[in-house]
Amino acid sequence: MDQDHLKNAKNATRRVGRLRSLGIVTVGGAALVAGITAYKNQDQLFRTFVMPAVRLLPAEASHQLAVLACKYRLCPVSQYHDDQNLHTSFFGRMLSNPIGIAAGFDKNAEAVDGLQDLGFGFIEVGTVTPAAQEGNPKPRVFRLTEDKAIINRYGFNSDGHQAVLQRLRLLRKKENFNGVVGVNLGRNKTTMSPIADYVQGVRVFGPVADYLVINVSSPNTKGLRDMQSKEKLRELLEQVNDTKSSLDKNKNVPILLKLSPDLSLDDMKDIVWVIKRKKSRVDGLIVSNTTVSRENIEKNKLAEETGGLSGPPLKARSTEMIAQMYQLTDGKIPIIGVGGVASGYDAYEKIEAGASYVQIYTALVYEGPALVEDIKAELSALITRLGHTNVADVVGTNSKFYLPK
């Protein structure tokens, strides 16, 4: 077969695949819309009907459907009133609660309004790359249902900087929108200048974001995690901070660093050395990304799939690492804790280990939108029951307990 015929065949196959995905999402979407139209605001419907039905779809198709549901604001609007003890400061902004949606759900800033409807205190979009890219070949998302976990190897599929920027600009123009939105920055798969990709991200999104995340910890882009090494990270963060200081607008935008849970203690010490230096400092940490480890999961053929594991099997390791980073930084660098949070109790553990804020994602896939209210209500009750006035009073109070034994 000559090259032109081969290229045409590949393009035809790709179009068929896209049409098939569109069909799956459209049919699933029709069912979802019908259910919501009839029973909107009844959380029990989501748990007993909508979520099980959505999970019958292929994992990536159900993800696309969930994004569409939030994009068109079809999910129940939260009626929960955040208790005063959940209110907390977030890099100069006030949050009504410390629970956020992690990057990876709304990769392209399409669903921010709908996510805010669910009651999140802050929203992180991305990962966003400079140029649009499709990511890794499909299938690339796998549910480990028995563990309520997910393995993904998306590979930074992204609409690119300019498309996401336009959406965020439109969002900021809305009179009734006052949400806290962070942008998670990545590099293109084929880039020859990885640092330049992050620098460009700071330049593009610095003026419109409430915070920026330097993501060098995804396991699904070759060579990315190498950028967590001491000298490479120092060089990257120095250039990021130089770019931030040169911004015409919002030059105090907080810079956060997202870390892998697979780092050794020596790796963590090297990172702390870097981020304590003035030129390569960061304003916060996100602990942690997905893991390549397959510990704490049931025997399952899907567990052999390549990619990052998220959900309950990651919970203990991410909490342990939060405690380690809290201790190594003397509690002076705010931490967003993420990994396996599925309840208010899980969130409380992350916070007493050293996290000031908590993000969720995988549990939302299994439990549905009512989970956000459930986590907040349980967390608020725990704070009161255990004798604290505010969530900020809990941060790091039991950090040493979670350190490796």
UniProtKB/Swiss-Prot annotation:
Keywords: Flavoprotein, FMN, Membrane, Mitochondrion, Mitochondrion inner membrane, Oxidoreductase, Pyrimidine biosynthesis, Transit peptide, Transmembrane, Transmembrane helix. PROSITE patterns: DHODEHASE_1, DHODEHASE_2. The chain crosses the membrane at residues 21-39. It catalyses: (S)-dihydroorotate + a quinone = orotate + a quinol. Substrate binds at residues 107, 152-156, 215-220, 289-290. Binds 1 FMN per subunit. Residues 40-401 are mitochondrial intermembrane. InterPro entries: Aldolase_TIM (IPR013785), DHO_dehydrogenase (IPR050074), Dihydroorotate_DH_2 (IPR005719), Dihydroorotate_DH_cat (IPR005720), Dihydroorotate_DH_CS (IPR001295). One of its GO terms (biological process) is 'de novo' pyrimidine nucleobase biosynthetic process. Pathway: Pyrimidine metabolism; UMP biosynthesis via de novo pathway; orotate from (S)-dihydroorotate (quinone route): step 1/1. Pfam families: DHO_dh. CDD domains: DHOD_2_like. The active site is at residue 218. FMN binds at residues 103-107, 127, 184, 215, 258, 288, 311, 340, 361-362. PANTHER family: DIHYDROOROTATE DEHYDROGENASE (QUINONE), MITOCHONDRIAL, DIHYDROOROTATE DEHYDROGENASE (QUINONE), MITOCHONDRIAL-RELATED. Catalyzes the conversion of dihydroorotate to orotate with quinone as electron acceptor. This is Dihydroorotate dehydrogenase (quinone), mitochondrial.
